[in-house]
C-alpha cells in the first residue's frame, strides 16, 4: 500500500524505538538475572533507563501522530481498540496460568508440603488487614477512573482532571502498601510452592499496577495539555480498560490466594 494513496490507514514511518525497546528489555532481564544471583545491579539499572527513555520517545511520537498530525482516523482507532482488547485477553491467559499453578498445588498438597495448605511452617497473611485495604483502594480507583471517563465524555475538563489525579494517587498508595507487605512478609519466594505462587501472582499483578499507573499518568499529562476531546480520547480509554482489568485480577487474587488460600 502506497504511503501517498488516498486511504484512511496510518502507515507508520521508520522508527528506532522498537529496536531500542528490545535492547532495553533484553538488558533489563539480563540485569535482573545477575541481580538475583547476587551480582551488581548496574546492568538492570541501565536496562531500565534505556526502556524508560524509549517509552518516553515512542509515546511522544504516538501522541504527536494522533493529536497534531491527525493520523489516528476512525479505521485506525478501530484497529487500536482491537489491539488493546487482544492484548488484555492475552494478559488474562497469562494470569490464568498463575491461578492454575496455585490451585493445582493447593487443592492437592503433596507429602513434602505436609499434605496441608498453607504448607507446614508458612505463616500466611491476614486477609483482613493490608490485603483488604488494598482491595478497597483498587475498587475506589475503579470508581474514580470511571468518573474521569464520564467527565471527559461530557467535556468536563476539571472533573476529568480530578478523577485521573485521584486514580493515580490511589494506584501509588496501593503500590506502597504492597511494597510494605513484601518487606514485612514472614516468608520468601524460596519458601516452597506457596512462596513461589504467591510472589509470582501478586508480584506480576503489582508490576501491572505500576504499568497502569504510568499509563494513567501519561493520560493525565496529556489531558491537562488538552490532547483529549469527548470524541477523540482512545489513549485514555485504553488506560481505563487496562485499569479495570488490573482491578478484576486483584479481586480474584484476593479471594483465592489471600482469603481462601490462607
UniProtKB/Swiss-Prot annotation:
Family membership: Belongs to the cytochrome c oxidase subunit 3 family.
EC numbers for this chain: 7.1.1.9
Quaternary context: Component of the cytochrome c oxidase (complex IV, CIV), a multisubunit enzyme composed of a catalytic core of 3 subunits and several supernumerary subunits. The complex exists as a monomer or a dimer and forms supercomplexes (SCs) in the inner mitochondrial membrane with ubiquinol-cytochrome c oxidoreductase (cytochrome b-c1 complex, complex III, CIII).
Domain of life: Eukaryota
Record-annotated membrane-spanning stretches: 39-59, 83-103, 120-140, 163-183, 201-221, 240-260
Gene: COIII
Function per UniProt: Component of the cytochrome c oxidase, the last enzyme in the mitochondrial electron transport chain which drives oxidative phosphorylation. The respiratory chain contains 3 multisubunit complexes succinate dehydrogenase (complex II, CII), ubiquinol-cytochrome c oxidoreductase (cytochrome b-c1 complex, complex III, CIII) and cytochrome c oxidase (complex IV, CIV), that cooperate to transfer electrons derived from NADH and succinate to molecular oxygen, creating an electrochemical gradient over the inner membrane that drives transmembrane transport and the ATP synthase.
Annotated Gene3D superfamilies: 1.10.287.70, Cytochrome c oxidase, subunit III, four-helix bundle
Keywords: Membrane, Mitochondrion, Mitochondrion inner membrane, Translocase, Transmembrane, Transmembrane helix
Molecular function as annotated in GO: cytochrome-c oxidase activity
Location(s), subcellular: Mitochondrion inner membrane
Protein's GO biological process: mitochondrial electron transport, cytochrome c to oxygen
CDD domains membership: Cyt_c_Oxidase_III (cd01665)
Mode of membrane association: Multi-pass membrane protein
Pfam families hit by this protein: COX3
UniProt-recorded name of the protein: Cytochrome c oxidase subunit 3
Catalytic activity: 4 Fe(II)-[cytochrome c] + O2 + 8 H(+)(in) = 4 Fe(III)-[cytochrome c] + 2 H2O + 4 H(+)(out)
Organism: Anopheles quadrimaculatus (Common malaria mosquito)
GO terms for cellular component: mitochondrial inner membrane
UniProt-listed InterPro entries: Cyt_c/ubiquinol_Oxase_su3, Cyt_c_oxase_su3_dom, Cyt_c_oxidase-like_su3, Cyt_c_oxidase_su3-like_sf, Cyt_c_oxidase_su3_a-hlx
Amino acid at each position: 500500500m502506497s504511503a501517498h494513496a488516498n486511504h484512511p490507514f496510518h502507515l507508520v514511518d521508520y522508527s528506532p524505538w522498537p529496536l531500542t525497546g528490545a535492547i532495553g528489555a533484553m538488558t533489563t532481564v539480563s540485569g535482573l538475572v545477575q541481580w538475583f544471583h547476587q551480582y551488581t545491579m548496574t546492568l538492570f539499572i541501565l536496562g531500565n533507563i534505556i526502556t524508560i527513555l524509549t517509552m518516553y520517545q515512542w509515546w511522544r511520537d504516538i501522541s504527536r501522530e494522533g493529536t497534531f498530525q491527525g493520523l489516528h482516523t476512525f479505521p485506525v482507532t478501530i484497529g487500536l481498540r482491537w489491539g488493546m482488547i487482544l492484548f488484555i485477553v492475552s494478559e488474562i491467559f497469562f494470569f490464568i496460568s498463575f491461578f492454575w499453578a496455585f490451585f493445582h498445588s493447593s487443592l492437592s498438597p503433596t507429602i513434602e508440603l505436609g499434605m496441608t495448605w498453607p504448607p507446614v511452617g508458612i505463616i500466611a497473611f491476614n486477609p483482613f488487614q493490608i490485603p483488604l485495604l488494598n482491595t478497597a483502594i483498587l475498587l475506589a480507583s475503579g470508581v474514580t477512573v470511571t468518573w474521569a471517563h464520564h467527565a471527559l465524555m461530557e467535556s468536563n475538563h476539571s472533573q476529568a482532571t480530578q478523577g485521573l489525579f485521584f486514580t493515580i494517587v490511589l494506584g501509588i498508595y496501593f503500590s506502597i502498601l504492597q511494597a510494605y507487605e513484601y518487606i514485612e512478609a514472614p516468608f520468601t519466594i524460596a519458601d516452597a510452592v506457596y512462596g513461589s505462587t504467591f510472589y509470582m501472582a501478586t508480584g506480576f499483578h503489582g508490576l501491572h499496577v505500576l504499568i497502569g499507573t504510568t499509563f494513567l499518568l501519561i493520560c493525565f499529562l496529556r489531558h491537562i495539555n488538552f490532547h483529549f476531546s469527548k470524541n477523540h480520547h482512545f489513549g485514555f480509554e485504553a488506560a481505563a480498560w487496562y485499569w479495570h482489568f488490573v482491578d478484576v485480577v486483584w479481586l480474584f487474587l484476593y479471594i483465592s490466594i489471600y482469603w481462601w488460600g490462607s
